[in-house]
């Protein structure tokens, strides 16, 4: 039973963190503007999720590749390092200023668009509909790409 729960949580960590960001932004008692709070919590959740994914690409490349429906590649190490790097910067941004968050949001949005394109391409041309290639993770990636810049711009507008 415990093993199943742990497996479920670890296998669905990005989705759980995504939902938790909205809940925490809603219940956090803070005078800050809601989009700014949500931006912070989403960046923290994205940071943890990217660090987690990067760790798997680096330490367990066979497991990471098979969950996406891909073959193991030497490039997994590079994407793992990129994921861990932006993950750590996104985590740090939770405690930093809006000016610090801006470039993090920009990078995450552009990177997410590229990642989504790659996963769509694999689904369309290679028929790869694995859950971690063309499932909820892809949906969350697309939402991050669109929502993070909107929240950032709303927070900047309110601050101005």
Question: Model segments located where?
Answer:
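Non-cytosolic membrane-interface motifs at loop->transmembrane helix junctions
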Residues: 4-6, 65-76, 128-140
